Amino acid sequence: MLRNGNEGMSTIPGFSQIQFEGFCRFINQALAEELDKFPTIKDPDHEIAFQLFAKGYQLLEPSIKERDAVYESLTYSSELYVSARLIFGFDVQKQTISIGNIPIMNSLGTFIINGIYRIVINQILLSPGIYYRSELDHKGISIYTGTIISDWGGRSELAIDKKERIWARVSRKQKISILVLSSAMGSNLREILDNVSYPEIFLSFPNAKEKKRIESKEKAILEFYQQFACVGGDLVFSESLCEELQKKFFQQKCELGRIGRRNMNRRLNLDIPQNNTFLLPRDVLAATDHLIGMKFGTGILDDDDMNHLKNKRIRSVADLLQDQFGLALGRLQHAVQKTIRRVFIRQSKPTPQTLVTPTSTSILLITTYETFFGTYPLSQVFDQTNPLTQTVHGRKVSCLGPGGLTGRTASFRSRDIHPSHYGRICPIDTSEGINVGLTGSLAIHARIDHLWGSIESPFYEISAEKAKEKKERQVVYLSPNRDEYYMIAAGNSLSLNQGIQEEQVVPARYRQEFLTIAWEQIHVRSIFPFQYFSIGGSLIPFIEHNDANRALMSSNMQRQAVPLSRSEKCIVGTGLERQTALDSRVSIIAEREGKIISTDSHKILLSSSGKTISIPLVNHRRSNKNTCMHQKPRVPRGKSIKKGQILAEGAATVGGELALGKNVLVAYMPWEGYNFEDAVLISERLVYEDIYTSFHIRKYEIQTDTTSQGSAEKITKEIPHLEEHLLRNLDRNGVVRLGSWVETGDILVGKLTPQIASESSYIAEAGLLRAIFGLEVSTSKETSLKLPIGGRGRVIDVKWIQRDPLDIMVRVYILQKREIKVGDKVAGRHGNKGIISKILPRQDMPYLQDGTPVDMVFNPLGVPSRMNVGQIFESSLGLAGDLLKKHYRIAPFDERYEQEASRKLVFSELYEASKETKNPWVFEPEYPGKSRIFDGRTGDPFEQPVLIGKSYILKLIHQVDEKIHGRSTGPYSLVTQQPVRGRAKQGGQRVGEMEVWALEGFGVAHILQEILTYKSDHLIARQEILNATIWGKRIPNHEDPPESFRVLVRELRSLALELNHFLVSEKNFQVNREEV
């Protein structure tokens, strides 16, 4: 939080700052911490010792550029050099060696792994420490338990049973006496009794036999091992038994870590040093004391709130990368030990360089990281749909992943909004579906304390004395466990009269409760109305007038907006659009002042301080979501520029502001049922004037391989048995030409796969050709890359990547231009979404009193029940802004200045627009905001006045071209013989339970029978029915059962139930009855 000259003002922190801070901590601290833990590798037989030093490690600059890494499908990484020492007898060697490559974060806060942009999102987990809870059993008796959570996520429970004996549950099945556990950890009975507040309870439950088991540490360890590992018989104490117990129990369940030690000390009032990060007997005894106090009413009876953010911690990119680095160093240790043995077998003199070789040992580091980025649930493909998604993706927090919750098992309480989320995690922005409440987004002012993993939120200190004493502390960052002790005034309540503040009462938050208290009792207040929301929520104008569910949908749908060919910034915004676009890094900002020498579509040449700087531009590059990323220069040749000025704008930005959609004229009225149930009626103007036209880039790739016989596949244009028309776009190498227009079914890359002679089907004609002309039959199979359905477009790029002569990969990029069409999804910024149902000629659209036809018609019934009234304010203010040539940037909760502030603003602007344009219909006092409009087909006015306005409408990535699908025949499931599911597999349309009910309701028995049997899983009938349908013949009626019935019979047979079936008809019914 930076403060400028104006004392009350503050700037919003960089939105990608959290990712950068995390990675910097990994590079500067975490690497050294892990290298310090690397043990000295000793081989006593040969008097050899190998050691790595944390001091003075170096990371080289990446050997390739970002663009080249993406182009050649490589990992953007940096080589790590560390100091190593090898002691061999009396010979000591020191060298700086490379131990491998580490992926490097780029300016977007992402990593490039094998040419793909990936991002690591933050995980929110329960902090290590101890948590108490009480619950009632089936008899209504309170059961008190204390759960100890380790840094690894392992859990152990302390509980008191009905006989008042204290147990430690170390696994689901095994519980161990607390005395045995304490003794196994190194305490004798006297020390235990001296360190507890209730020694009589500890002495009451062990009998003579149990006391004998804990006489010494060795006996206690044997008893503990027998109970923990469920091992019977007589065990003998040994070092290997201790090591196994250490590995299986103490390491996983007793390592608290730095955060766990702090939490344990704080919860149990202990003063154990912070560097002692393991669970001690003293911790266990203090925890048991507290549990006894809760049981007998002498301790604090409050349960720990597991959902409070003070009991959670954030695992950022630094922690996750540090874990992987430690894992890689562990593998490196084993590899070095093997290499040492190999060196002595060969009887060669070792050096640090020979022990860590680039080919075998140091490759472990990069492979560990590539596996992590490829398989770890919190490593995701970077969402590049539009600039907003790029900014928001790195600010996600997830409860899912290793050590966290799962979508299937998480409770309602763990998903719900908690008072401690206020100003830290957005109460609105979360995913819909099974993961609702489990993935969230950080509030815009929140920051992560990387030392303790807590989320902090800024507040203004009200106390005048403190402000005078220490001015820089005017803004304080409070962690979740600190803000419970402060009276916090909400910044979005009605503003105070500056003159008589002391006499005012204000709503405030104290200890998770909302109170109304006097102003002088307030300690801190919110700094910004946006403080509680994420970026997505902060971009919704008039959010305070919307239902939270619709705001949630809006913040999600803004991330699905497709960049349009001609972007336009919103008339009504919130003021956060500029910073969102800036932090997405899609635009190019001048880093120094200078003069423009020249600009073109590929680069900008800038002269600064006597140097010529070339700034490359992104030119029609495919994003991870197949949208088009493109930068256009915005500075003319010869212009002098200043530092911070925009040189080139990216997709979906205008003038440095986010521009995801278009301002279009909308009317809220029904129209012939075409906007029933959220359907949207649009004008053909949006199609012909390319208002909602977007560009999409599809990638198609093919790779040559070596067959099982050792023959190599070949890329060529010479493909037999194919029409010349399909090969028309190929060059002499067999690859499609740049700039070609390709249609469905065209060949993009010609490829032949060799086959052995026995695989080729020799037909009679082949023998004749060989006998007459001496021609050999082709023994190759055509396996070319063909353009799939819906892939038509212009070839804009072809990449030929050849790692070795036999391994060739060809990638073809095709640009598609998509106008808006029936079936596309559009949405506003208030959760008002819909599908295009009809495109009307502009002359048939309803038109205003000045003759302007409306662009979109929404259903008015979509507003009252959804309670997203913000769209009404936005459309009316947008109309006024369009007529007055103004843009508005309105912070939320403007009712804090006066009652009905939003309504007053909208009406005053509409009235001004009406006066300026001399159009009285813009503001009619009887029905402000509404107007009489006319039917385009008849010219008659509609009966009721209609709300018209300019709304900012987005086109979403759910487009009909990627959804529409049909099938006659295709692949079938092997077991059920029913059509497979999904568009990608050319699957069929599912007729489910409810669809069957609908058909039953209409009594269409024959159609129902065809759908469920003949057309689906009747092997013989489905072949005949296709032929009968094509030729218009009668559909045959087969009497044998379909395949799914046979599957049912076989399943019953596997349960030892025999089911026989036979056909009963009019002819054989009498016979069968007599036989029976």
Swiss-Prot record:
According to its UniProt record, which reaction does this protein catalyse? RNA(n) + a ribonucleoside 5'-triphosphate = RNA(n+1) + diphosphate
| Enzyme class, broadest EC rank | transferase
Query: Pfam families this protein is in?
Result: RNA_pol_Rpb2_2 (PF04561), RNA_pol_Rpb2_3 (PF04565), RNA_pol_Rpb2_6 (PF00562), RNA_pol_Rpb2_7 (PF04560)
Per the record, the domain of life is: Eukaryota
Keyword Ribosomal protein recorded: no
- Which BP terms from GO are recorded? DNA-templated transcription
The cross-references to InterPro entries, in alphabetical order and at most eight, read:
DNA-dir_RNA_pol_bsu_ext_1_sf, DNA-dir_RNA_pol_su2, DNA-dir_RNAP_su2_dom, DNA-dir_RNAP_su2_hyb_sf, RNA_pol_bsu_bac, RNA_pol_bsu_CS, RNA_pol_Rpb2_2, RNA_pol_Rpb2_2_sf
Question: What PROSITE patterns is this protein classified in?
Answer: RNA_POL_BETA
> Keyword set for this entry?
Chloroplast, DNA-directed RNA polymerase, Nucleotidyltransferase, Plastid, Transcription, Transferase
GO MF assignments: DNA binding; DNA-directed RNA polymerase activity; ribonucleoside binding
UniProt-annotated location(s): Plastid, Chloroplast
- Note the NCBIfam families from the entry: PRK00405.1 (NF001616)
Q: What does this protein do?
A: DNA-dependent RNA polymerase catalyzes the transcription of DNA into RNA using the four ribonucleoside triphosphates as substrates.
The entry assigns this protein to a family as follows: Belongs to the RNA polymerase beta chain family.
Subunit-structure text: In plastids the minimal PEP RNA polymerase catalytic core is composed of four subunits: alpha, beta, beta', and beta''. When a (nuclear-encoded) sigma factor is associated with the core the holoenzyme is formed, which can initiate transcription.
Enumerate the PANTHER family for this protein: DNA-DIRECTED RNA POLYMERASE I SUBUNIT 2
Name the record gives this protein: DNA-directed RNA polymerase subunit beta
